[in-house]
């Protein structure tokens, strides 16, 4: 095996292509690619990728299957066992649970975006077994964006930096260590004269690079977009030909945006009306214009409307036909993930049992059913797996786990997913996990979720596995990632676990691929190549449908056109047009509560050295950002009597957490930023330490998933604007 490999870094979710080389001492050196690449510009490597081998070889990595032999869940009494014993016992217990409660009693949380090695086989296993209850943190991070894109224009839309003359950024905190490849794409675009509009309450480095910076109030993005649409329509700046030929609902949209004149939008957002108009005109006239994905609008009370309004902005200025935006499709080189997943094997009565169907159906099988025929017409697949699809609602899943209503969920798998910390209302997630008869965790470290498991199975590292991207449909390009070294210890790939369990559950005939390499060869079989040859090409662009040409097939919506007025949302009983409603817990909507909780909370803002709840183990990455930090503007901190460098409590009506305070002039006055995913792996596990600090430091302790705090269409929690908080000394 050659020592130098071409690898897709999976340290975060941007997936930069890097080179990896095994040195004489056995350590792996990762560095930026040396040749031109269509998806990754030169010098695109961050500190997480540079130090990836320190995580792979960390002394605390789980290298062998472990069984908790304690008398109660969460008791840290671990016994090393074999894979065969673990799989045999898991299968036996799962069979008993299914016999008693039905297959829907299995719930699964999976992280697809950083794993990318099972190619739909987990959903295949669940569908054949009869469980619809798969969920992911993608429910509130890009997966929901993809869902909204689908109902609006059939598929997820990618911004093309190289083909854009104007970029609209929404709270994207790019840097040399955060989405570095896109940061380099941005700098290259600006160098050639591309315009940049930035919407961000914080004065970030990217905001300082902008032609127009709109420091809007947290959570008011939907209102600002509606104001921009108002300007573009009323000033006749839209692409009339595209709107007339390929959009439906324009007149209804035009009527709706009259409710959002610039003076009203300025009052809502806190931005200058003239600057909003200037941004709208720039976006419409500096064509082609694009809006790269940003997580901020995935996590708001008005999330669905904010995402819908972005789709509409792209459409009415012609971005889908001038090269600025690319509508994806199942990759032409690959067997569709949807075919592998076998959604048709899941009975209709089980689809209707998917948790969340009755309360927040949009992202479930029921909500997506209106897109089955259009997807089959355009893409040849009925169940289009576009960046996470057909998901159980996380709140409904954890509630069923905790309360056994509307029915019991008694077995839970966390696959590359720190599920305890990954969703809002961590208290309820803990109750749900404690109420399980079987918890299985597949991961690299003893995470807080793993500490609650019956079995912890050692997962492989991205330097230890070959990968064919993507692991979902709708991405117009793909990359191959070569295996650099064999997995450490007894670590296995995700497909190994899925297939071996499927065999023990009587499903072997549906898993004909004996190992991951056979599965990869099946996935790439349309090319006529096998992995040994295919991996050498490094990247591959998909052949996309002709959506909008003279013989265009249209998009995969019920009308075949971009639905400015959504027939899918109308059918589900939702507002078919975007809107802005003030969240129920702000200083405007609840001034009395704001007297006790005077701060507006913002959860997130990525840090350089970690990704979500990963890479907090002691070492070079943790040393860069050792503590969980809250950010307050110096004036706000002074008014509260809170000096920088002291530990504080941050409290909402839902809970509180302990953080180290740092004064930050970029943080808007009257607001507080809290980090996501912080815990202390160096601490002992178990309930005595709050599962290594997770119950003390993680943002989900203060984030409610009650109905008042959920986006009404998607049923996802508001994390980024519209939650009142207070801060005080410990």
Curated annotation (Swiss-Prot):
InterPro entries in UniProt: Acetylene_hydratase, Asp_de-COase-like_dom_sf, MopB_CT_Acetylene-hydratase, MoPterin_dinucl-bd_dom, Mopterin_OxRdtase, Prok_Mopterin_Oxidored
UniProt xrefs under CDD domains: MopB_Acetylene-hydratase, MopB_CT_Acetylene-hydratase
Domain of life, source organism: Bacteria
Cofactor: [4Fe-4S] cluster; W-bis(molybdopterin guanine dinucleotide)
Catalysed conversion reaction: acetaldehyde = acetylene + H2O
Pfam families assigned to the protein according to its UniProt record, in alphabetical order: Molybdopterin, Molydop_binding
Binding-site positions, W-bis(molybdopterin guanine dinucleotide): 48, 111-114, 141, 172-173, 177-179, 199-202, 218-221, 296, 300, 416-418, 422-423, 442-444, 460, 465, 602-613, 676, 699, 720
Consequence recorded when altering residue 48 to A: Does not affect catalytic activity
Active site: 13
GO molecular function: 4 iron, 4 sulfur cluster binding; acetylene hydratase activity; metal ion binding; molybdopterin cofactor binding; oxidoreductase activity
pH-linked activity: Optimum pH is 6.0-6.5.
Thermal effects: Optimum temperature is 50 degrees Celsius.
SUPFAM superfamilies reported for this sequence: ADC-like, Formate dehydrogenase/DMSO reductase, domains 1-3
Ranges annotated as spanning the membrane: none
Keywords, comma-separated and alphabetical: 4Fe-4S, Iron, Iron-sulfur, Lyase, Metal-binding, Tungsten
Entry's cofactor comment: Binds 1 [4Fe-4S] cluster. Binds 1 W-bis(molybdopterin guanine dinucleotide) (W-bis-MGD) cofactor per subunit.
EC annotation from Swiss-Prot or TrEMBL: 4.2.1.112
Binding site for [4Fe-4S] cluster: 9, 12, 16, 46
Summary of the function given for this chain in its UniProt record: Catalyzes the hydration of acetylene to form acetaldehyde. Ethylene cannot act as a substrate.
Additional information: The tungsten center binds a water molecule that is activated by Asp-13 residue, enabling it to attack acetylene bound in a distinct hydrophobic pocket.
Subunit structure, interactors included: Monomer.
Family the entry assigns: Belongs to the prokaryotic molybdopterin-containing oxidoreductase family.
Protein name: Acetylene hydratase
Species assigned in the record: Syntrophotalea acetylenica
Lineage: Bacteria, Pseudomonadati, Thermodesulfobacteriota, Desulfuromonadia, Desulfuromonadales
């Amino acid at each position: 095996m050659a020592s130098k490999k071409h690898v897709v870094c999976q340290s975060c979710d941007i997936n930069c292509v890097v080179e990896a080389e095994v040195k004489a001492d056995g350590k792996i050196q990762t560095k930026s690619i040396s040749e031109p690449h269509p998806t990754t510009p030169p010098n695109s490597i961050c500190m997480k990728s540079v130090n990836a081998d320190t995580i792979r070889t960390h002394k605390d990595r789980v290298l062998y299957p472990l069984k908790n032999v304690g008398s109660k869940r969460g008791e840290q009494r671990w016994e090393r066992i074999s894979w065969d014993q673990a799989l045999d016992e898991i299968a036996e217990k799962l069979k008993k649970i299914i016999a008693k409660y039905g297959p829907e009693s299995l719930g699964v949380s999976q992280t697809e975006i950083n794993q990318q090695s099972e190619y739909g086989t987990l959903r295949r296993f669940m569908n054949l077994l009869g469980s619809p209850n798969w969920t992911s943190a993608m429910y509130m991070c890009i997966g929901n964006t993809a869902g909204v894109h689908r109902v609006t224009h059939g598929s997820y839309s990618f911004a093309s930096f190289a083909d854009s003359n104007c970029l609209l950024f929404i709270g994207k905190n790019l840097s040399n260590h955060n989405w570095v490849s896109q940061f380099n794409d941005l700098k290259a675009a600006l160098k050639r004269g591309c315009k940049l509009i930035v919407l961000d309450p914080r004065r970030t480095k990217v905001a300082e690079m902008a032609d127009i910076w709109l420091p809007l109030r947290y959570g008011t993005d939907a209102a600002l977009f509606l104001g921009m649409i108002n300007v573009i329509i009323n000033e006749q700046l839209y692409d009339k030909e595209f709107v007339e030929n390929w959009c439906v609902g324009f007149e209804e949209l035009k009527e709706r945006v009259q409710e959002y004149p610039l003076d009203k939008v300025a009052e809502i957002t806190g931005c200058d009306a003239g600057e909003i108009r200037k941004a709208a005109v720039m976006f419409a006239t500096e064509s082609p214009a694009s809006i790269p994905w940003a997580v901020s609008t995935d996590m708001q009370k008005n999330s669905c409307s904010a995402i819908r309004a972005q789709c509409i902005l792209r459409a009415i200025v012609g971005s889908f036909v001038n090269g600025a935006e690319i509508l994806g499709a199942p990759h032409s080189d690959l067997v569709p993930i949807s075919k592998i997943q076998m959604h048709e094997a899941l009975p209709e009565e089980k689809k209707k049992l998917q948790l969340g169907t009755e309360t927040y159906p949009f992202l479930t099988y029921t909500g997506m059913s209106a897109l089955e025929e259009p997807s089959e017409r355009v893409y040849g697949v009925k169940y289009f797996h576009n960046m996470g699809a057909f998901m159980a609602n996380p709140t409904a899943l954890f509630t069923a786990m905790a309360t056994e209503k509307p029915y019991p969920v008694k077995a839970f798998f966390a696959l590359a997913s720190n599920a305890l910390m990954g969703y809002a209302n961590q208290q309820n997630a803990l109750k749900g996990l404690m109420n399980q008869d079987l918890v299985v965790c597949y991961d690299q470290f003893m995470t807080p979720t793993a500490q609650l498991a019956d079995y912890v199975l050692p997962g492989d590292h991205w330097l230890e596995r070959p990968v064919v991207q993507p692991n979902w449909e709708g991405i117009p390009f793909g990359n191959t990632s070569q295996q650099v070294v064999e997995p450490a210890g007894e670590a296995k790939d995700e497909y190994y676990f899925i297939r071996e369990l499927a065999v023990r559950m009587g499903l072997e005939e549906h898993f004909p691929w004996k190992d991951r390499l056979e599965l990869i060869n099946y996935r790439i079989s349309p090319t006529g190549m096998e992995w040994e040859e295919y991996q050498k090409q490094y990247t591959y662009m998909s052949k996309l449908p002709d959506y909008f040409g003279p013989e265009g097939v249209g998009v995969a919506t019920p009308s075949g056109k971009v639905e400015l007025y959504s027939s899918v949302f109308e059918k589900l009983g939702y507002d078919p047009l975007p809107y802005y409603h003030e969240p129920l817990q702000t200083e405007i909507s609840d001034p009395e509560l704001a007297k006790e909780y005077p701060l507006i909370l913002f959860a997130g803002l990525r840090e350089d050295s970690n990704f979500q709840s990963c890479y907090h183990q002691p070492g070079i990455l943790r040393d860069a950002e050792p503590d969980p930090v809250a950010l307050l503007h110096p004036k706000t901190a002074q008014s509260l009597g809170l000096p920088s460098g002291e530990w504080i409590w941050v409290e909402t009506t839902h809970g509180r957490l302990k953080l180290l305070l740092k004064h930050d002039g970029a943080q808007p006055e009257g607001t507080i930023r809290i980090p996501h995913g912080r815990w202390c792996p160096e601490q002992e596990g178990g309930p005595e330490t709050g599962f290594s600090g997770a119950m003390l430091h993680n943002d989900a302790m203060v984030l409610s998933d009650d109905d008042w705090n959920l986006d009404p269409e998607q049923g996802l929690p508001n994390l980024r604007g519209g939650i009142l908080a207070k801060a005080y000394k410990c």
